[in-house]
Amino acid sequence: MPKFRHLLEKHNIGEKIFTDIRDRLEESGLLMHGGTIVDATIISAPSSTKNRTGTRDPEMHQTKKGNQWYHGMKVHAVVDAGTGYIHTIEGMAANVHDSTEATKLIREDDHVVYGDSGYLGVPKQEDVIKDEHLSQIDYRICKRPSSLKTSKDYEGINWEKQMENRISSIRCKVEHAFLIVKRDFGYRKVAYRGIAKNMNRFHVLFGCANLLMCIRAGRTEQFRNKQVAPMAG
């Protein structure tokens, strides 16, 4: 089995499986364009040195989220804002800030991008400001909760908070993809040393997550036939 896995990794079979599933969704009309949701999740790695080499994985790093420290890698999942299907994933060390990788994950025809407060700095990045496409995108990024507070005696509607709730209701689609991989598939910790080896598996897992979402939505017939059923009415 290890030899077979190494063969899959060598030829990037995991990524090819993910790409094939995504392309089939697109050809079936089940994957839309124009809007993208970006998010990242931390996948824990053993911090122990109790292994064959007696050392930690040099590609895994520590990062702080809230008041808690994590050791491992980070996976960015980028989903279609219209359907929730995953169109891109990217892996990196856990200590890489979300905003530094965001622009690499945006499609050429995206004109709206949703994200949490970790991506607040994206519109201000120099490469975004100077890029003809990236600078024209509408970045709908959730603000930090602390910036939405009103005085205790304020009796009106907090419209800013209402807008944030609206953005969050769209952005939560990406959480569904992570939920499938972590809860349904049980992949909460890295299985191998090195980001590339783990990403080979993540490509397969997120590809399967797309299939599962397609099945749950009752769209398997369209997926198999690569065509969308005519709309009623």
Walk through the language-model features, giving the residues of each.
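Intrinsic disorder/low-complexity segments
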Residues: 178, 191-192, 210, 230-233
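A short, flexible helix-boundary coil/loop motif
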Residues: 217-233
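Helix-centered, glycine/charged polyanion-binding patches within enzymatic domains
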Residues: 111-112, 117-200
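Membrane-helix cytosolic exit motif
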Residues: 208-220
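Polybasic low-complexity intrinsically disordered regions
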Residues: 1-133, 144, 203-210
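Extended hydrophobic-aromatic, low-complexity segments
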Residues: 101, 150-151, 217
